């Protein structure tokens, strides 16, 4: 697994976040993939407030307790809301530009760090991974590595709150059946590359995990997984705890 942070020259999302923070607007943050048509991420969405968050994210922030770690914190929308609720939160991200913006926006404890970096240590009661938190595993084969790493950072009575989506809807035919190649790669594995203005990021793997698969992998890792909120479009929020 990658353990380092991004260089500013290869941080398109961070550059877009910085522009929006400084000027209230940003150019197109393009999302490329070998599997889908080109898409665009609305940068304003990264600055959303509680009322504009999907119910899965709202529920995660409501459920968070104790010493909270927000992984992949982006522009800091979740960390800021937790602070407003009076909760203690540490925000980490691999984007130095995003981390600077979070500090300027008032997030009190920010560190530019990759969660897989061995020098990152701590014990947290709640670990948040939102906006498709399983994504950072990249591949299904790496999901146990992610979960085991989170176990190291979780207090004995702690919890992981992570969201994802089941991409099976992409393979649904007109009759409502799902045309998925069970002999091919796991259907939730995708690749992305982000481009902002003249800044092109490195291609990266991203993992969407269906609830049944997430529960099975959690069980392999000595963890219990419970789906506590379901969204409108195959998205969900899971609560993961240590198996007693």
Describe these PLM feature segments:
Residues 7, 15-20, 155-215:
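SAM-dependent methyltransferase
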Residues 44-67:
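Conserved alpha-helix/loop element of class I SAM-dependent methyltransferases that forms part
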Residues 1-30:
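N-terminal auxiliary segments of SAM/dcSAM-dependent transferases
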Residues 143-156:
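A short glycine-rich, Lys/Arg-flanked "PGG" loop and its adjoining helix->strand segment in the class I
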Residues 106-117:
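Conserved SAM-binding strand-loop segment of SAM-dependent methyltransferases
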Residues 75:
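Conserved SAM/SAH-binding loop
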Residues 124-144:
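A short SAM/SAH-binding and catalytic strip from SAM-dependent methyltransferases
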